[in-house]
Regions:
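Alpha/beta enzyme core
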Residues: 1-157, 192-198
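Extended, intrinsically disordered, low-complexity segments
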Residues: 145-198
Length: 198
């Protein structure tokens, strides 16, 4: 019921795709330990219900079975999800290049997702290498966040030690930051609204 309603609402909102997973709730990052997955029948039902609800939303079926039951079970689940109507497969956290190649060979012609997390479970091949294997979507969910976090830590360390951040350090200029944030457009919109009230 929840899957059907969510997918129907997403379709009405114009969403192009939705990811459905086989992890239990509360879920964990795919590159963390101690994950658990729901039975295959339950996970498959989620996919089937989503597909029966609409054909207008792409269904990305994710399995975390490599971590809990190994690659063979993850492949079995992916086969079942495809048969139930999934459009894209996301087999989370392969632990070697061989596993990535096995997935790509097994699902030739099926759009595949690779999730690359620095210091995570999956090796970090170049995006073009993954593309050649057949991965259509490559996620780098924390790459920028990890780099920014180190920069924040350095700046706050300098401040905590009574100093000031290095003014010559690589950074975005304040006016460029405001431009990136869309401040000019916001100001123009506020001016437009102010003029409408006069």
């Amino acid at each position: 019921m929840n899957v059907a309603r969510t997918v129907r609402d997403y379709a009405r909102a114009g969403v192009a795709g939705i990811q459905l997973e086989d992890q239990v709730h509360p879920k964990k990052c795919g590159h963390m330990e101690n994950k658990a997955i729901v039975p295959l029948a339950e996970a498959t039902l989620r996919i089937r219900v989503a597909r029966d609800t609409t054909a207008d939303v792409a269904i990305v079926a994710r399995t975390d079975a490599i971590a809990t039951d190994g690659l063979d079970e993850a492949l079995r689940r992916a086969d079942t999800f495809l048969a139930a109507g999934a459009d894209v497969l996301f087999i989370e956290a392969p632990t070697s290049t061989d596993e990535l190649e096995t997935i790509a060979t097994r699902f030739v012609g099926v759009p595949l997702v690779a999730n690359l997390v620095e210091d995570g479970k999956t090796p970090l091949p170049a995006i073009d290498v993954l593309g050649e294997l057949g991965f259509a979507l490559v996620l780098r969910p924390v790459s920028a966040l990890l780099r920014v976090t180190e920069t924040l830590r350095a700046v706050y360390r300098e401040l905590a030690q009574g100093g000031a951040p290095d003014p010559d350090a690589q950074r975005v200029r304040f006016d460029e930051f405001n431009r990136l944030a869309g401040l000019d457009e916001i100001d123009a919109y506020v001016d437009q609204l102010s003029g409408a009230q006069e």
